Amino acid sequence: EAGIAVGIAPSRFISNEHLTEMVEHFRGRFVGMASIDSANSIRENLDIIRTYAVDGPLKGIHFEPGHSSLPLYADDPKFYPIYEYCQEQGLVVGIMLGGNNGPNLINHTNPAIITQLAADFPGINWFICHGGWPWVTEILGACFWHENIWIEPDLYMFNCPGAQEYINAANGFLQDRFMFGSGYPLLPLGETVKRAREMFSDAVYDKVMYKNAAELFNLT
């Protein structure tokens, strides 16, 4: 009904096993990302990545360390072996950086985190969920300097402070690394697709809505 053919699905509220089953059952409709947990040991997280992303059908990992039972920052040195492995395997790394992202809502969303990670791991394409909001100018600056950062602000590009900055970036320098996110179920699918059509120029609309994600996740 909303014209959405393919969706990105991190395993936020379901297990990696169930996400894998969903991706395989609805083949071609969902791009899955394996979730890891900062409360796990490094070995446990590496095993998850190997099982579900390297040897399985999931396209990368999704990480929300601020939401864990052991809240940490994504640039904690503890996680560097995980990132090293993802870089070796050519996996996309998605990090929740924005919105309600940990006990300290400002510090856990600080774009200084991804700026450091993008510099330390230039071989990783970093996928920033929630677009680094509310640090809009700062995250866009990080994207300007680091071409391995991709963002999708989802609901934060609709009627939130800084929304126009996202839209200007998508229609300009960031048009090849900016992706649409519906914000569903917080926002209705049909309405967000309709509003996105009004936000983006004809030259970049297809990129933002599909082509950029297809390139990032190597979809054929």
What residue spans do the PLM features occupy?
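Flexible loop residues that form catalytic
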Residues: 12, 66, 131-132, 156, ...
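Conserved, mostly hydrophobic/aromatic
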Residues: 19, 52, 61, 86, ...
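Active-site phosphate/pyrophosphate- and oxyanion-stabilizing loops and adjacent acidic/basic residues
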Residues: 17-21, 50, 115-116, 140, ...
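Active-site gating/metal-coordination segments in enzymes
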Residues: 5-6, 13-101, 105
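Mid-to-C-terminal alpha-helical segments outside catalytic/metal-binding sites
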Residues: 1-6, 173-179, 187-220
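N-terminal cationic-hydrophobic initiation segments that often serve targeting/anchoring roles
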Residues: 23-27, 53, 118, 143, ...
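A structural signal for short coil/turn segments at secondary-structure junctions
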Residues: 2, 26-27, 56, 121, ...
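Catalytic pocket-lining loop regions of alpha/beta-barrel enzymes
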Residues: 59-60, 73-179
